[in-house]
Curated annotation (Swiss-Prot):
Keyword Transport: yes
Location(s), subcellular: Endoplasmic reticulum membrane
Membrane topology per record: Multi-pass membrane protein
Function per UniProt: Plays a role as a mediator in the endoplasmic reticulum (ER) cholesterol and bile acid homeostasis. Participates in sterol transport out of the ER and distribution into plasma membranes.
Family: Belongs to the ARV1 family.
Any Pfam family hit: Arv1
Matching InterPro entries: Arv1
One BP term from GO: regulation of cholesterol metabolic process
Name of the protein in its database record: Protein ARV1
Entry keyword annotation includes Membrane: yes
Length: 266
């Protein structure tokens, strides 16, 4: 999730160029969330001056001078300022790739748990084909559960928005924020590779971390309070749990490998 230096910012040549920034290209102050026309001004010969927010009188985005590692650490700590920098003041187009990789990680975890709990006397070719098919199946199930989680969030916001008389949230930005904030699922692979007695606990902690990151992404994107953000995430988790229950029943009816869901953490 980290971004580096001045990546994703725009500035004109000199003071006049910076002042002529289009009003449609707005940034956000990472401290007070007010809109800003620019992040810094490039006067000449690389002399830069960070723009001061007119509302809070603090730098609009101090992270444009920070190292990507520092930004990533602050994002891991779920700092609001780091999330605003990443979501509003940078241009990151890895949402789809990151989502796909996270789904592969989750599918691998489920596939690994399934293979670890099942033994078959069938020939090697049959076992190899069955294992490959199981991985594809786990990927599809993980995709459905992820889609259910996102659908639950969007459905709750769609129902709740008319009640609050607020403007409709930017669902595209929220989708990108949720996909980016799910980067914690990448930790599933190290947890499986370096297996030990505390692996089940690690998997649960990863799940909690991902949900916490989703909560912070919702809170920053919608600029709302903690209570509503928590309800939004819980709505997505509820619909995801319903889909998990559906797959449990389906697996129980059509095959005998439903023990996978009993032993897995997600």
């Amino acid at each position: 999730m980290g971004t580096g230096g001045r990546r994703g910012t725009r500035s004109g040549k000199g003071t006049e160029g910076a002042a002529a920034t289009s009003s449609s290209c707005l940034y956000r102050c990472i401290e007070c969330n007010r809109e800003a026309q620019e992040l810094y001004r490039d006067y000449s010969h690389g002399v830069l001056k960070i723009t001061i927010c007119k509302s809070c009188q603090k730098p609009v985005d101090k992270y444009i001078e920070y190292d990507p590692v520092i930004i990533l650490i602050n994002a891991i700590l779920c700092k609001t300022q780091a999330y605003r920098h990443i979501l509003f003041n940078t241009k990151i187009n890895i949402h789809g790739k990151l989502c796909m990789f996270c789904l592969l990680c989750e599918a691998y975890l489920r596939w690994w748990q399934l293979q670890d709990s099942s033994q078959s006397p069938a020939p090697d070719d049959v076992i190899r084909y069955a294992k490959e098919w199981d991985f594809y199946r786990m990927f599809v199930i993980a995709s459905f559960e992820q889609a259910a989680f996102l659908t639950g969030i969007f459905a709750f916001l769609w129902v709740q928005q008319p009640m609050t008389a607020k403007r409709a949230p930017d669902f595209v930005l929220l989708l990108k924020a949720l996909l980016l904030s799910s980067y914690g699922k990448l930790l599933l692979i190290p947890a499986v590779i370096w297996e030990h007695d505390y692996t089940p606990l690690c998997l649960r902690l990863i799940k909690v971390f991902v949900l916490t990151s989703n909560f912070q992404a919702v809170r920053v994107t919608l600029n709302t309070n903690r209570r509503l953000s928590l309800l939004v995430v819980l709505s997505g988790l509820l619909l995801e749990s319903i889909v998990v229950f559906f797959f449990q029943r389906m697996e129980w009816d059509v095959s005998s490998d439903c023990a996978l869901y009993k032993s897995q953490d997600f």
